[in-house]
Amino acid sequence: MGNTIRALVAFIPADRCQNYVVRDLREMPLDKMVDLSGSQLRRFPLHVCSFRELVKLYLSDNHLNSLPPELGQLQNLQILALDFNNFKALPQVVCTLKQLCILYLGNNKLCDLPSELSLLQNLRTLWIEANCLTQLPDVVCELSLLKTLHAGSNALRLLPGQLRRLQELRTIWLSGNRLTDFPTVLLHMPFLEVIDVDWNSIRYFPSLAHLSSLKLVIYDHNPCRNAPKVAKGVRRVGRWAEETPEPDPRKARRYALVREESQELQAPVPLLPPTNS
């Protein structure tokens, strides 16, 4: 259904698109899914709220900045996609949808999340990437069943210690933030399987060898002078990731300094000879 709608509205002027979509949605879809992604919506079509058995609702890539209270009638909703819209605040009605398992909020203009988000105790996956977050909202630490957290491309400088409460968390994506140190709280979360801190400003990585569940760590595009130590079988993606054993930190520091000086002087600098250690 969603693909059909998108194919049709591509040929409809923006000022007529909203009315067309409303008329098209006359019956409850058999698959209990409505996909209005990329439909140029500026307001939510209220008729959708009559589909009380709806399980999946995709509103990605529109021009929405609010949602009506009638959305709260969709109490069977498990997946809600609001990414790539114009939300500056999360509509309170979203926090009343207590069956939500997956919530996509990426690529909006969110600076915080409401405390009422803690009511979504069935939430397993939360995407809040590419917003305006300068710190991870405390309410995220109250989502006890959360398994996947995507908070990349924000302006995070650190993570709250309360994050360790999320003992079901398995994957955390933090790429493209402003981390200058590896978040200490992650060292106390042995249940994590995937850690992504790509594109930050981390200069030193502590050992991650004690994280017994870890399967993948992505640390590329950091000004680091060492690679994180990991247990056998854990995949690393970043500088020195394929070297075994891990490079001598002294040699790594010397290499990094030479490279930095070379870039500053904009002239080639010979590599230092290896030490005998």
From Swiss-Prot:
SMART domains linked to this entry: LRR_BAC, LRR_TYP
Gene Ontology process terms (BP): cardiac muscle cell development
InterPro entries: Leu-rich_rpt (IPR001611), Leu-rich_rpt_typical-subtyp (IPR003591), LRR_dom_sf (IPR032675), LRR_domain-containing (IPR050216)
Cell compartment(s), UniProt: Nucleus
LRR repeats: 53-74, 76-97, 99-120, 122-143, 145-167, 168-189, 191-212
Cellular component terms (Gene Ontology): cytoskeleton; mitochondrion; nucleus; sarcomere
Keywords assigned by UniProt, alphabetized: Leucine-rich repeat, Nucleus, Repeat
Main location: nucleus
PANTHER family referenced in this protein's UniProt entry, alphabetically: LEUCINE-RICH REPEAT-CONTAINING PROTEIN 10B (PTHR48051:SF51), PTHR48051
Function, as annotated: May play important roles in cardiac development and/or cardiac function.
Protein name: Leucine-rich repeat-containing protein 10
Native species: Homo sapiens
